[in-house]
């Protein structure tokens, strides 16, 4: 594996940069940190890496790992680089200054000098960052009914252009060389929703537009060249009651305005995923009720390839456009299929990545990184790297892993051409020693029937209820059988009717059920109190980080002594 391949991770206790070579070591000048970090990201060109702690934001060079800049941006929760890495945006929670004015919580920094370039109030965390043109000459942000455009070299001067569209709720700048913007206006008072594209800064008339109903929100998906736009629409509620998550539709628009259409799909059901190929000539869709169907379309919405139905909901094209990944994540099993587009969509391998929450091709398209992260899943957190042939390359476990991702790298056109013309697959390199653990990891056993925590490790506490249901279902036809069985309430003293035969059967049953009931009650109390104690510890940690707490949260911290006293009364010890 090339030394240029690198990935980063953020866990509960550390930040790491790892050169993905045979020894999987950090860059020579990278200083490992042992304090928690709130976010981390690479610049899109892969040259810079930034992470935010409670007190500052640090920017590192990715090749050497050396620390370049420290920004005085405390309490930063979000980070985002401009396309060429010249600017870094930071976002912190909204608040007020000492004089009561809103705090300018969104800030833009120059990564070379560390100077603050621009700041403003940004209340919403969703869509918080500026959007840039590919050359970084312009930056844009959404305000009420307008998109404001700034010259990046002189943001403090204010917007140089404004696109006013009544009711606009979302926008997306084109990544192409010709500067363009797409905007979405949702349905209102019976009028249809619409998507329009404009050339910047000529806003007199749109380049293209499409109107449609059944659209409460959209996802914009430009191809890499910025010549075509996919618009995935979604309603909050499916009025036909066929889909719990609302109704989805897909539209394709050409930037010149000479072509637009709704992408017709031959199966009912939701659109699970849609994405462009890196060559900008094709896009793929996973759609329909499970098992879902996958189809590849050209840039005129004509089907060029179909992959057989399977329980999959995620589609990813490799950066070199040769490989197609289909996976079933979320509530599906976690199987990943990899297909070779250069060999008539032949399946290369299937990788089992149970509970995977993140999946990404390496920039050279030879490797796959899968990760299980918190808070989505708090068990089995790990990073796994696989070769494109399915061979395991690297494996590392974490107590709590929050992020893991490859360093971006511009694709070499020569490598792209070679990948598409070569009929053979690359051979896997020598794996890291940790890969043996991944290869030897046992398959997941069936979980079996669910049992409540208090009933685990002992006879079922629900056996009485099951027996009662069985008896009741037999009805009056078996009255002579029912008359010989006495109903017993768990934990209660049985009624003695003087019949020795019945007493012999009843007493053991009462003994089995009554004893665990008291134990379960105490266990539940201890678990509930321990949960309160953990919440108090978390609040104390936030208080130590100078976070402002609500009055109810402060009161909760003050109740720590009472909680500990109740736990000790139940026989709990800190080591238990």
UniProtKB/Swiss-Prot annotation:
Record's subcellular location: Cytoplasm
Keywords of the record: Cytoplasm, Initiation factor, Protein biosynthesis, Repeat, Translation regulation, WD repeat
Highest taxon of source: Eukaryota
Gene Ontology molecular function, alphabetical: mRNA binding; ribosome binding; translation initiation factor activity; tRNA binding
GO BP term, example: regulation of translation
PANTHER family, A to Z: EUKARYOTIC TRANSLATION INITIATION FACTOR 2A
Protein name from the UniProt record: Eukaryotic translation initiation factor 2A
Source organism: Schizosaccharomyces pombe (strain 972 / ATCC 24843) (Fission yeast)
Lineage: Eukaryota, Fungi, Dikarya, Ascomycota, Taphrinomycotina
């Amino acid at each position: 594996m090339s030394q240029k391949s690198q990935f980063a991770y953020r866990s509960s206790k550390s930040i790491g940069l790892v050169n993905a070579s045979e020894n999987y070591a950090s860059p020579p000048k990278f200083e490992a940190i042992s304090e928690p970090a709130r976010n981390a990201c690479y610049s899109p060109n892969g040259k810079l890496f930034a992470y935010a702690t409670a007190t500052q934001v640090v920017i590192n060079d990715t090749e050497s790992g050396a620390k370049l800049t420290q920004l005085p941006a405390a309490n930063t929760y979000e980070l985002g680089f401009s396309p060429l890495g010249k600017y870094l945006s930071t976002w912190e929670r909204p608040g007020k200054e000492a004089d009561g004015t809103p705090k300018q919580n969104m800030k833009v920094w120059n990564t070379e000098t560390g100077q603050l370039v621009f700041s403003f109030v940004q209340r919403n965390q969703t869509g918080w960052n500026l959007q840039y043109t590919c050359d970084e000459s312009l930056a844009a942000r959404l305000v009420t009914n307008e998109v404001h455009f700034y010259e990046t070299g002189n943001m403090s001067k204010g917007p140089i252009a404004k696109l006013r569209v009544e009711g606009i709720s979302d926008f997306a700048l084109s990544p192409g060389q010709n500067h363009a913007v797409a905007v979405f206006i949702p349905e209102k008072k019976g009028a249809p929703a619409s998507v329009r594209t404009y050339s910047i800064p000529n806003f007199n008339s749109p380049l293209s537009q499409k109107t449609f109903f059944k659209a409460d929100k959209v996802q914009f998906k430009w191809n890499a060249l910025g010549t075509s736009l996919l618009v995935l629409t979604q309603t909050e509620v499916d009025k036909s009651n066929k889909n719990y998550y609302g109704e989805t539709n897909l539209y394709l628009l050409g930037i010149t305005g000479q072509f637009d259409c709704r992408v017709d799909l031959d199966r009912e059901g939701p659109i699970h995923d849609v994405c462009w190929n890196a060559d900008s000539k094709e896009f793929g869709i996973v759609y329909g009720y499970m098992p879902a169907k996958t189809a590849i379309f050209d840039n005129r919405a004509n089907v060029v390839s179909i992959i057989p139905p399977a329980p999959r909901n995620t589609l990813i094209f490799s950066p070199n456009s040769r490989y197609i990944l289909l996976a079933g994540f979320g509530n599906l099993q976690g199987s990943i299929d990899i297909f070779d587009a250069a060999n008539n969509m032949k399946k290369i391998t299937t990788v089992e990545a149970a509970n995977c929450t993140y999946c990404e091709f390496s920039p050279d398209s030879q490797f796959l990184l899968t990760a299980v992260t918190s808070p989505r899943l708090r068990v089995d957190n790990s990073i796994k790297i696989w070769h494109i042939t399915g061979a395991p390359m690297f494996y590392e476990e974490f107590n709590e892993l929050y992020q893991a991702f490859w360093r971006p790298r511009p694709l070499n056109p020569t490598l792209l051409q070679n990948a598409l013309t070569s009929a053979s697959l690359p051979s896997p390199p020598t794996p890291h020693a940790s890969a043996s653990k991944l290869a030897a990891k046992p398959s997941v056993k069936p979980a079996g029937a669910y049992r409540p925590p208090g009933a685990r490790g002992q006879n079922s506490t629900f056996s009485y209820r099951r027996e009662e249901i069985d008896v009741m279902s037999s009805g009056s036809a078996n009255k002579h059988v029912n008359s010989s069985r006495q109903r017993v309430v768990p934990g209660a003293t049985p009624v003695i009717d003087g019949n020795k035969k019945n007493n012999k059967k009843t007493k053991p049953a009462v003994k089995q059920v009554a004893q665990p009931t008291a134990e379960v009650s105490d266990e539940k109390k201890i678990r509930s109190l321990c949960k309160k104690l953990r919440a108090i510890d978390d609040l104390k940690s936030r208080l130590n980080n100078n976070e402002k707490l609500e009055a109810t949260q402060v009161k909760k911290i003050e109740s720590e002594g009472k909680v500990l006293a109740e736990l000790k009364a139940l026989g709990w010890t800190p080591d238990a």
